[in-house]
UniProtKB/Swiss-Prot annotation:
This is (-)-kolavenyl diphosphate synthase, chloroplastic. Inhibited by high concentrations of magnesium. InterPro entries: Isoprenoid_synthase_dom_sf, Terpene_synth_N, Terpene_synth_N_sf, Terpene_synthase-like, Terpenoid_cyclase/PrenylTrfase. PANTHER family: ENT-COPALYL DIPHOSPHATE SYNTHASE, CHLOROPLASTIC (PTHR31739:SF4). Expressed in peltate glandular trichomes of leaves. Highly expressed in the first leaf pair. Changing residue 200 to I: No switch of product outcome. Belongs to the terpene synthase family. Tpsc subfamily. Its main location: plastid. Involved in the biosynthesis of clerodane diterpenoids natural products, including salvinorin A with potent agonistic activity on brain kappa-opioid receptors, thus conferring hallucinogenic properties. Diterpene synthase that catalyzes the formation of (-)-kolavenyl diphosphate from geranylgeranyl diphosphate (GGPP) as the first reaction in salvinorin A biosynthesis. It comes from Salvia divinorum (Maria pastora).
């Protein structure tokens, strides 16, 4: 009796509400218990009625049927969930298509500086009355102005600026009184605030506003120790500001000109970018007040119109928005739905890319390492030609900074530089220096529990940094990264720190998070179905009798599912996992040279007979039978029997002769995956394919050697060899990264090239990650539910 008809076909509602027929994957005639450590269904009353060969054949066939059921869309899917997924995808596409100069929240502080500008036509009234209207309409219930997240620095600065603006134009005295009451009640509490949350230039901006307030006869308590401390910081910083230098070349000081005295505006106007000073509305408003410059006016008119009277703390922020939005889609594991939009984003960024790097907005005269690092990383990942020269101006004496001349080390800036450095090509020494510097700095911050950033208040920055340090780029399996980032990403709740707190609406977005969770749950449900079918195959092939553990079975499937994770890649995923399992099973057999030769000869001879006659000649060796049946089923309907048999024959010959099994296994996996994915056989002879095959198999050999040496190094006898091998691995991975992420005129598809990196990455992951860490990853990726 067929297992699919032996009992009724119950269904279970899996993750995301996907109704799934259990009988397509699970043999219901046996009982199971669940192992919480691995998520394994352990057999408790198993009685196999078939011999290994026929049972295995049917088990493989059922696994294939399960895969094809999923692949061809026969699995019932909750229509409401599917409709919601489509809606979210389309909504995000519309967001990307509408990207312009940046969707960013309004800053009351900057709006107040704009509102202070007097009509340059000489009427005596405000140049921007709608800015005053915005201020009057946006006071909070407690009398303050600011972001919905309460940070006292932000609230005090915004509130004082708005009170000064309204008082200047003798408007809304009741609102001013309410705002001053908030300031009076809270200003002394600044001493208790975390300095990492202090907005950019706060120690300059607040004293400037207090001085303005005094001229308007506004009483601000300024005798407290906290205010005196801020004034002391201002005086110290002003003494360090090279006033002569800032008039000679662009510096980051252009972002915070408001309130500064003794400025030579004729010289500073040469440093405008599209009318603004480093895209700062408040700085530009201050310049307009002093210069009546037409370009400043045009810039502010555009910004005020865009934001209905208000202005952000920076505008435009187009480079920032384009890059960070793409980064979020990638890390959440949903970038595959938006390839066209991502290409358009990166084409836009590359249009304004320079060998000195970029800033948060296009055509800026100052660059920063944070945006430059993110841009470098994403552009290199997508095959754009970018030079490492962008990092030169951020390095001095072996240390790296966020902005030239400022040796500050914001966590996120160093984190993104670290991530960029991991995409180094051979001989890119400055990236090696950057990786060492940032890794050490981030590690020190981690061990001292001081991962707090000056640029963003996010859900779990320590977790993001920990993942980057613990799972390097070479070992970061796509589904593993997505699973962790789903918990670390705060969506709409993440808030950035500039001159004031602000939101990047297309960077920190609940819509991304909603789609990512739906997508992950769907993939996880598919993977759990496949895993159940894999266990059935394992039992019916009696692989346990050959010494293969259920943990090895699970590890093989996890590696494949964490890399080729998309539901439509079932064939590749199962072929990858099954090939890995059979390789391990065969290698674990303790056979003499003669027995190995007999094993190989039997496989070769029967494969020839079966390929010629289209039959199923039964071998005498049970494991040979398992192998032949598996190859036959993997090739079914594809016409790749001969190619798969040849790939296995090559691996078996290497095994028989005691050759390099790491290299041979990599070649076998690549051929199997490519044949299973339907890659045209002509691609196998492509020069780039051969280059990638050689580089991948070489580094996989080194990784397998490292893994074996590390296992033997417990006695401390092979540490020198481990060091040498590690150096060779790093060199090999750099060469492979260059081959994969560099576009040539006659190139392979990016998906084909990526498959080589996927195999190398899987070897790297298993070689470097401890077993207990891998076990926790398996549980998290395959079995732990997304909340």
């Amino acid at each position: 009796m067929s297992f699919a008809t032996s009992l009724p076909r119950p269904t279970t509602t899996g993750a995301a509400g996907f109704g799934l027929p259990l009988a397509t994957c699970i043999s219901l005639s046996v009982s199971h218990s669940f192992s919480p450590k691995f998520g394994i269904c352990n057999n408790t009353s198993l009685r196999l009625k078939s011999k290994a060969g026929s049972g295995c054949y049917e088990g493989i066939h059922r696994s294939q049927l399960a895969a094809s059921t999923i692949l061809e869309g026969h699995t019932p899917i909750n229509p409401e969930v599917e409709s919601e997924k489509i809606r979210l995808i389309e909504r995000i596409r519309l967001m990307f298509r509408s990207m312009d100069d940046g969707e960013i929240s309004v800053s009351p502080y900057d709006t107040a500086w704009v509102a202070l500008v007097e009509d340059i036509g000489g009427s005596g009234g405000p140049q921007f009355p709608t800015s005053l209207e915005w201020i009057s309409n946006n006071q909070l219930d407690d009398g303050s102005w600011g972001d919905r997240k309460f940070v006292l620095y932000d609230r005090i600065l915004n509130t004082l600026a708005c009170v000064v603006a309204l008082t200047t134009w003798k408007m809304h005295p009741n609102k001013c009184e309410k705002g001053l009451r908030f300031i009076s009640d809270n200003i002394e509490k600044l001493a208790d605030e975390d300095e990492e949350l202090m907005p950019v230039g706060f120690e300059i901006a607040l004293p400037s506003l207090i001085d303005l307030a005094k001229r308007l006869c506004i009483e601000i308590p300024d005798n407290s120790a906290s205010i005196k401390n801020i004034y002391a910081k201002r005086d110290s910083k002003l003494k360090r500001i090279p006033m002569d230098l800032m008039h000679k070349k662009p510096t980051s000081l252009l972002f915070s000109l408001e309130g500064m005295e003794g400025l030579n505006w004729d010289k500073l106007l040469d440093f405008q970018s599209e009318g603004s000073f480093l895209s700062s509305p408040s700085s530009t408003a201050y310049a307009l007040h002093h210069t009546k410059d037409e370009l400043c006016l045009e810039y502010l008119l555009k910004a005020v119109k865009k934001f209905n009277g208000g202005v952000p703390n920076a505008y435009p922020v187009d480079m920032f928005e384009h890059l960070w939005s793409v980064d979020r889609l990638r890390r959440l594991g949903i970038s595959r739905y938006f390839q066209v939009e991502i290409d358009e984003c990166l084409d836009y960024v590359y249009r304004y890319w320079t060998n000195k790097g970029i800033c948060w907005a296009r055509n800026m005269c100052v660059q920063d390492s944070d945006d430059s690092s993110m841009g470098f990383r994403l552009l290199r990942l997508y095959g754009y030609d970018v030079s490492i020269d962008v990092f030169k101006q951020f390095e001095e004496g072996g240390q790296f900074c966020s902005i030239p001349g400022q040796m500050t080390h914001a966590i996120t800036g160093m984190y993104n530089l670290y991530r960029a450095s991991q995409l180094m090509f051979p001989q890119e020494h400055i990236l090696a220096d950057a990786r060492n510097f940032t890794a050490n700095l981030l590690h020190q911050k981690r061990v001292t529990n001081s991962i707090v950033d000056k640029w963003i208040i996010t859900k779990d920055l320590p977790g993001e940094v920990a993942y980057a340090l613990d799972v390097p780029f070479y070992a970061s399996l796509p589904r593993l990264e997505a699973r962790f980032f789903l918990e670390q990403y705060g969506g709409d709740d993440d808030v950035w720190i500039g001159k004031t707190l602000y939101r990047m609406l297309y960077v920190n977005c609940n819509t991304y998070l909603e789609l990512a969770k739906l997508d992950y749950k769907h993939c996880q449900t598919v993977h759990q179905l496949e895993w159940n079918s894999m266990q059935t195959w394992y039992r019916e092939c009696n692989l346990g009798e050959f010494g293969l553990s259920e943990r090895s079975l699970l590890l093989a499937y996890y590696i494949a599912a964490s890399t080729a994770f998309e539901p439509e890649k079932s064939s590749e995923r199962l072929a990858w996992a099954i090939t890995t399992i059979l390789v391990e099973t065969i290698m674990s057999q303790e056979l003499s040279d003669e027995q190995k030769r007999e094993f190989v000869d039997e496989f070769v001879n029967i494969s020839i007979i079966n390929n010629q006659n289209g039959g199923r000649y039964k071998p005498g060796n049970r494991l040979v039978e398992v192998l032949i049946n598996t190859v036959t089923l993997m090739a079914e309907g594809r016409g790749t029997d001969q190619q798969l048999s040849n790939a296995w024959k090559n691996w078996l010959k290497t095994w028989e002769e005691g050759g390099d099994l790491g290299e041979a296994e990599a070649r076998l996996l690549l051929h199997t995956i490519h044949l299973s994915s339907g890659l045209d056989e002509s691609s196998f002879s492509h020069p780039k394919y051969q280059q990638l095959l050689e580089a991948t198999s070489k580094v996989c050999h080194q990784l397998r050697l490292f893994q074996n040496l590390k296992a033997n190094d417990a006695q401390g006898s092979t540490s020198r060899l481990v060091t040498v091998t590690t150096f060779q691995i790093e060199a090999g991975m750099q060469e492979l990264v260059k081959l994969i992420f560099t576009k040539t005129l006659e190139d392979l598809t990016s998906a084909t090239k990526q498959s080589f990196f996927n195999i190398a990455r899987s070897f790297y992951y298993t070689a470097y990650c401890p077993a207990d860490t891998i076990d926790s990853h398996i549980n998290k990726v395959l079995f732990e539910k997304i909340v």
